[in-house]
Amino acid sequence: MLDLKSYIRDVADFPQRGILFRDISPLLREKFSETIGALSALLDADEWSQVDAIAGVESRGFILASALALRHGKGFVLVRKKGKLPPPVVGLPYGLEYGQGVLEMQPGAGRLLLVDDVLATGGTLHATAALAEQAGYTVLHTIVLLDIKLDPAFRWDRPPVRAALHY
């Protein structure tokens, strides 16, 4: 089996001192199809059949979610930083491993798969799931490329987050 982790580069002190950044750029450049295949395999055929659309979190989540949406014939929903989507939007503040932000999405309906690149502290995933529900969606599943759980106290009261790679 292909070791996708070997294509991820560790960058110390980025984007700020004390952060170890997992750079997925080499993985996407060299093994994009295999990466999407690994993410796709996190759900079985029955689970995929229940998903109406795939929500990708800005910005690397867009890359993964849009490719999955194309592969599975699903809609694609943007979850963006504040001020990047035209109204109407629903917004929610959230915490990052190195700051604060506000996520927004346009209102809608349907059953969503949430996709992001990394599970670190869980702040972005918690906010995205809550935001999606406020915007009118039902969250069925959540997947990430990398699970690096920086917060050992991370709690998720939904179906488990599935990850292609664990650190």
Predicted region positions:
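Short glycine-rich phosphate-binding loop at a beta-alpha junction
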Residues: 49-58
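Acidic, divalent-metal-coordinating active-site segment for phosphoryl/phosphodiester hydrolysis
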Residues: 116-129
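Short, glycine/charge-rich flexible loops or terminal/linker lids adjacent to PRPP-binding catalytic cores
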Residues: 74-113
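Short Gly/Thr/Asp-enriched flexible loops that form oxyanion-binding sites at enzyme active sites
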Residues: 63-72
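Conserved acidic residues
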Residues: 51-52, 110, 140
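PRPP-dependent phosphoribosyltransferase catalytic core
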Residues: 4-7, 126-167
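Active-site-facing substrate-recognition patch
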Residues: 1-50, 106-108
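Generic enzyme active-site microenvironment
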Residues: 56, 114-115
